[in-house]
Each structure stands twice: as structure tokens, then as C-alpha cells.
Amino acid sequence: MFSFLRLPFLFFLLMFTQSTQAEPDFKIPPIQESMKKMYQIQEKDFTFEDKHYRLFIAVPPKTSQKLTALYTLDGNAQFPIAVNAVNPHKPLPLIIGIGYISDKAYATEERMRDYTFPAEGAEFAKGGKAADFLRFIQQDVKPYIEQHFDINKEKQYFFGHSFGGLFGLYVLFHQPDLFQHYTLASPSLWWGNGSFLPQHEPWISQKPSHILITLGYYEEHPEQDPNITEEQLQRINQRKQMRTINAHQLADILVKQGNSVAFISIPNKNHGGSIPDAIKHCLEQVQQ
């Protein structure tokens, strides 16, 4: 049995935002007792260019096989979801949640800063530091993981939701070989009015093994969401007007450019509500 090291999560009221805002208000679930027996949970804090980060790491028992690694953004909230979603009857992956030294489920300002492309306009002024965050992953996160764990460098998976999914696109456009498999869950394609899309083709210079794009059904059909308010519907429609491409079109374009891409619409789920399902779909690929 493995020990459970400190995991200082605060539990918030259970609710998902019914809008396309980047930070779902989501209760952080405790890691299930059964998974605590299968994983050792570790934390490692980093300071990079005066910014503070925390890795949450789920370490499976040692085997003779190299480990498949899953890296997820928004680690404070989505790391425990990923650990709980692992199929215990299949080979266990190493799970790395990249988060912040914070008790918040979602560090709103930090994730906007770190996960987004540079863009003009007052609405985007607090973002645009994806290049810095990518360097942090390249220079600190990946070397630390590769030094301490025997991972299979041909089986490294990325998961990001909302702004995290947008950051996945940034990596694909600038350093696609950093991971081999990408899950872009409900990517915030409205950011910068779509100005982040490359002007050259193909958009991805080195094709990854696979890209999975997921989207909650109600994100594209918000008028069918039984719980949506008029204010939320207006905001979603405003976001739609800001984008130049939707998730379906993104998948189609990437396929036409020669990439292996799958698109999954998650039934009866909105932006925040689709997170657990998207993580499960990602893990099905990780553990196949």
C-alpha cells in the first residue's frame, strides 16, 4: 500500500458554471480511498521567473514497463478527477497535474495569464504569456519528471480544458513534439477573436500521434440547456461571435492537414459540466 502525502484541497460548493467563461466553479473531489491504495500522491513546488507553481503527481507501483505519462493543466482541480477516473484493471499511468500554490480550484488570473496567446484588446490584456508557461514546462516540469520517473517518451499525453485546451493548441503550433497525444477539451477558440490561428499551412509542423477534441453538447446548442439563464445565453452568443472557427471546424481543418484527429460531443453537458467526461475519454486513450 502506498502512502498518501499532503494534498491540501479545500472543498467548494458543487456547481458548474453554465457559461463559456474559462474557469468553471467546481468542487474539488477527494481522491477515492481505492485510488489512494494504488497510487502514491506527491507534490513538488516550483518558482519560475517569479511565478509559483505546484505539481501534483500520482505515482503507480514500479513495474518492468516504462510508464505512460498524462500531464493535465488546472492541476489543483483536475488532477484528482483524473486519478479517480483511472481504470484500475489496466496499466496505471503516471499522472502529473500542473497547478498553482493555491487552495483555489481554479487560479483565475494565473491560468488566463499562462494558458493564452498574445492578443490585442482590453479584454485580453491579462493574458498572453503562453510562451513563458511553455518554457516552464520545457525547462522545469518535463526534466523533473524524466529525472525521477521511468517514463515512455513515446507515450506522453496532454490534457487541457477551456483555456487549457487553448494552451494545447499553442503547444501544437509551437512545440508539437513536446507530447505525443493531445486532448483539447472545450478549447477557448474565442480568445483574441481567433487571431491566434496560424497564417501558414500546415498549422502543425510535426504531426502528433493523435489529437482528441471534446465539446459539451450544450456549448454549441445552449438554447437547449434546461438550466441556462438569459444572461448566460447572451454571454455564450457573444463568445460565439468573437471566434472565427468552432471546435468542429478546427477538427475538420486539422484532419485535412493530415493529422489524426477525433471529435467527441459530450451529451447533455455544458462547458464546465463536460470536464469529467472529457478526462474519462482522455484516459481511455491513455490506458488503451
Named regions from a protein language model:
Residues 1-9:
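Bacterial N-terminal signal peptides that target proteins for export
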Residues 17-19:
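N-terminal signal peptide c-region/cleavage motif recognized by signal peptidases
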Residues 21-67:
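A domain-start/cap signature at the N-terminus of enzymes
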Residues 65-136, 140, 144-148:
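Serine-hydrolase catalytic machinery in alpha/beta-hydrolase-like enzymes
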Residues 150-161, 182:
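Alpha/beta-hydrolase fold nucleophile elbow
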Residues 165-176:
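Short glycine-enriched nucleophile-adjacent loop
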Residues 178-187:
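A conserved short beta-strand
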Residues 191-267:
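The feature captures the conserved acid-bearing segment of alpha/beta-hydrolase catalytic domains
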